[in-house]
Amino acid sequence: MQHLLSFVFLNLAGLCFSAAPPPTSAPIFSKPFVVIWNAPIYRCNQLQVPLDLDVFHAITTPQRVPNQVLTLMYYNRLGIFPYTDLYNFTQYNGGIPQKGNLNASLQKAQKEFDYYIPSSVPGLAVLDWEEWFPLFDRNADLREIYKALSINYTLQENPFLSSKEATLRAREDFEKAARRFMEETLKLGLSQRPNFLWGFYLFPDCYNYDFLNPNYTGKCPKSANVLNDKLQWLWERSTAFFPSAYMPVSVSKTQKAALFVRHKVLEAMRVAHLSQRPYSAPIYLYLQLLLRDQNGLYKDEVDLIRSIGESAALGAAGCVLWGSSYYFNDKESCKSLSAYLSNTLNKYVVNVTTAAELCSDLLCQGKGRCVRKNYDSDDYLHLNITNFKIQKIDGMFKVFGKPSITDLRAWAYTFTCQCYEDSKCRAQFGNI
C-alpha cells in the first residue's frame, strides 16, 4: 500500500489537551492500529479463487502452522490441561484443575511453544482455553459439571465436611489450581518468547449479552466488573488482551452493535490499567467477518464501522478477523468472500488504518495512539472522502490526498493521545 500524502504547516493555538489516558506499551508492529487476518484460505487457493488480502498487516491461520505472526494455541496445543467433556462427561487429564499434572502440562507446552513459535521476532501468542473458567462461579450452565466434580472430589478427600464447607473448599481449591495452570503457562511462554505478546482469548469478558433489553446500554453488569477484579493475577501476567466481540445478527445495523463492541473494549482497557506495570497492555479485539452463527451473511460497512472502527477509535492496538474453515469450504463461499473483500472490507480497512496512522503522526507526533475524548461518542477515525481518494491501482490500494485544516481540527476536538511507554507526546498540532 502506498500513501501519497502531502501536509501543510499548521499551528492550531489552544488545541493542546492535558487529560490524556495513562501510557500504553509501544506497538510491536510499528503501526498504531492493525487488522490481522486469522482464517484458513487453503481451500480457496485449491479452488483457484483469488483473495485480495494485501491490506492486512498479517495473513495468518488458526490451523497447525508454525512460525506465524499470530499463533493461536487451541486446547490440544496447550500442554495437558485437565477438562471434562461437557456432553458425555468423559474426564481428561484428571477432569478438573485440582487433579491435573501441571509439570507434565508445562513440559508438553514447552515443546509446543518451541514448535509453533520458533522465531524470536515480535508477534502475538493467543492461548485459547475455553473448557473451564478460572473463577468457580463463572462456570455456569453446561460448565456446572466442574462445580459438581470439584465438590465431590473435596468430599472424597474430606468426608466429614458439611455441604457448605465442601463447596467453599472446592471453590478455593479449584480457583487455586486453575490459576496455577493458566499463570504458569503464561510465565513459560513469556520466558521462552519474550518478544511475543501473550494472553488468553476471551479475557476479559464484559458479559454484555442482554440484547433483548429495550434499554440496552452495552455496559458490563457490575457483577462482571467485580469478578474481573478477582483476576488481577491474570491481568498482571498478560502482556496483551484478546477479548472477543462476535456480533449476532440481532444487533446488526443497530446502535446496539456499537455499544456491544464499545464496552467490550472499555472493560479490557479498565482491567489493563489495574496492572502494576507503568503502562497498560495493548488490546487486540477478536472479530468475525460474518455475523455470528450465520453462514454467508457478511457485515456491511455500518457493521464494520461499529466493530473495527469502534475499536480503533477507542484506542485498541488492532483487530483480529477470525474465521473457520467451515465458512470458506467450496467455490461458492470462496467467490462470495473474494467479492466481499474487493467490494467492501478492504477499502474500509485501508480507510481506518490510514486514518489511525495519520492521527497518530499528526496529533500525537507519532509517539502515541489517538483515542476518543468522549468514549461514548460516535466519533471515528476515518478519512474525509472529500479530501481523500482510495483507489486500486495495479492490484494495490493507494491513498491519495491530504487532510484539510478542518479535518485536523475535527480530530483535535474529538480525540486525544495515549502516549506509548517511555515516550512523551501531547495532543496538539505543531509544525508538520
Where are these regions (language model features)?
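N-terminal carbohydrate-binding/catalytic regions of secreted carbohydrate-active enzymes
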Residues: 43-115
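Aromatic- and acid-rich polysaccharide-binding/catalytic face
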Residues: 68-87, 91, 131-133, 137-169, ...
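Glycoside hydrolase catalytic-domain groove-lining segments
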Residues: 230, 236-237, 243-293
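Alpha-helical scaffolding within the catalytic cores
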Residues: 56-59, 109-111, 220-232, 263-272, ...
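Aromatic-lined carbohydrate-recognition surfaces of secreted/lumenal glycan-active proteins
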Residues: 36, 166-227, 261, 276-292
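N-terminal signal peptide
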Residues: 2-31
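Conserved N-terminal segment of EGF-like repeats
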Residues: 298-302, 327-432
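Substrate-binding cleft of secreted/luminal carbohydrate-active enzymes
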Residues: 23-48, 68-76, 238-239, 245-248, ...
